Amino acid sequence: MAGVLGMILAGGEGSRLKPLTETRTKPAVPFGGSYRLIDFALNNFVNADLMRIYVLTQFKSQSLYIHMKKGWNLSGITDRFIDIIPAQMRDGKRWYEGTADAIYQNLRFVEIVAPDQVCIFGSDHIYKMDIRQMLDFHRRMEAELTVSALRMPISQASQFGVIEVDENGKMVGFEEKPSNPKSIPGEPEWALVSMGNYIFEAETLSKELREDAENNQSSHDFGKDIIPKMFPRGKVYVYDFTTNKIKGEKESTYWRDVGTIESYWSAHMDLLDKDPEFSLYNRSWPLHTYYPPLPPATFVDVKDKKVKITDSLISGGSYIQGSTIYKSVLGFRSNIAAGSFISESVILGDVKIGAGCTIKRAIIDKDVEIAAGTIIGEDLEMDRKRFHVSDEGIVVIAKGSKVGF
């Protein structure tokens, strides 16, 4: 779409997702067997025919860079690009100080493209959005800034920017992560929260960021500084995410922040519902990613041990012998020896699990080897001595671990 530039913030450290983010940036964390978190934001742009995109990186970005190079290379296509921009440190030897500062330090790239509008989106949420519809709303309202929003239970709203709107969709109030969130009028159990997705008029964006950069009292963040300063002027509008319609999708609106171990695990379990809210199978909204050249998943019975797979996703290159897999997601090249039982678990790929293992409610990162007969997830006190265990009882085994040897 002409006149539009996409900028995806992909520099998140993801401290609440450790140990999954010990060796990679948050947007590079695998999801759903075949994808990385960054893929869902990129698909929202590409499926909306928005093909001029900068991806801004910062922490531990090598695996993200490799994934992008293999799966999202548009080189040779005139006026279409998906380019990774690592932290440049052009404005002093410092990391990005906030989301607004990340864009400010890369304004020169915006000026090179000279767009009319700039779409600034995060990269660590699971959802589908036709961004063209949000753009149409932004232009129709003649807004300087449009923020996408959705309803959230009031008990969870303090984790987000909380919004107030008038009957015309204009923002009339905003608080970033308030301790006592305001509810939607007439709906005391619900709040309207920011999704962290913004569409700016390019001239407005440049002006606001330059002013913010000169303010020594600012934290240089869109939610904490830019939006509170802009909305009283009356040109900030709120786009209702529930009005975004995608062919082949359900009416219900699925959006998940997967910033914690519990939410990451739960979002995987959502994929395994009988009729999931978030579908991987909509041909009208294909989910592009890098798919390595692998054979199909293979299932082999071993004597009296039969393969039994129920409510699970098994990715290419996997080899499963005589084991039971229940309500689990297995990434590329998962190798499961005979007699094992895996339940409600997420295996990120390139994992070898020995014979006779029992694994329950676990997340197993890449390149892990587990010895025969190992039991994980039944005795959490014992597991805490060896692994990371979340407050909700999800066992996480770090990348490259050797367990039981």
From Swiss-Prot:
This is Glucose-1-phosphate adenylyltransferase 1. Pfam families: Hexapep_GlmU, NTP_transferase. The gene is glgC1. Belongs to the bacterial/plant glucose-1-phosphate adenylyltransferase family. Keywords: ATP-binding, Carbohydrate metabolism, Glycogen biosynthesis, Glycogen metabolism, Nucleotide-binding, Nucleotidyltransferase, Transferase. It comes from Vibrio cholerae serotype O1 (strain ATCC 39315 / El Tor Inaba N16961). It catalyses: alpha-D-glucose 1-phosphate + ATP + H(+) = ADP-alpha-D-glucose + diphosphate. Involved in the biosynthesis of ADP-glucose, a building block required for the elongation reactions to produce glycogen. Catalyzes the reaction between ATP and alpha-D-glucose 1-phosphate (G1P) to produce pyrophosphate and ADP-Glc. Gene3D superfamilies: Hexapeptide repeat proteins, Spore Coat Polysaccharide Biosynthesis Protein SpsA, Chain A. Its EC number is 2.7.7.27.
